[in-house]
């Protein structure tokens, strides 16, 4: 499977509680924090919910 790197580029404040919970489940707390994951359908769905807050790169 491919790996995905997710980077938080916008603040989580001012968003809905569901979006904040999604960021927390991705492990993103601070701006410019990055996490790497294996690409799964669940992960892709989570990223779609917060796509305006994160930057995604595939490797």
Swiss-Prot record:
Question: Which GO terms are recorded in the biological process aspect for this UniProt protein?
Answer: translation
Instruction: Name any one GO molecular function.
Output: structural constituent of ribosome
The record's keywords, sorted A to Z, are:
Ribonucleoprotein, Ribosomal protein
Which residues span the membrane?
A: none
Q: Mind telling me which GO cellular component terms the entry cites?
A: large ribosomal subunit
Gene3D superfamilies per record: Ribosomal protein L30, ferredoxin-like fold domain
Q: What's the family?
A: Belongs to the universal ribosomal protein uL30 family.
Subunit structure of this chain's protein: Part of the 50S ribosomal subunit.
- This chain belongs to which protein, by name? Large ribosomal subunit protein uL30
| Natural source organism | Solidesulfovibrio magneticus (strain ATCC 700980 / DSM 13731 / RS-1) (Desulfovibrio magneticus)
């Amino acid at each position: 499977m491919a790996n995905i790197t997710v980077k938080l580029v916008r603040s989580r404040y001012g968003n809905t509680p569901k979006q904040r919970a999604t960021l927390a489940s991705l492990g993103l707390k601070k701006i410019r924090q990055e996490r790497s994951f294996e690409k799964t359908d669940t992960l892709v769905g989570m990223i779609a919910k917060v796509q305006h807050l994160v930057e995604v790169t595939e490797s």
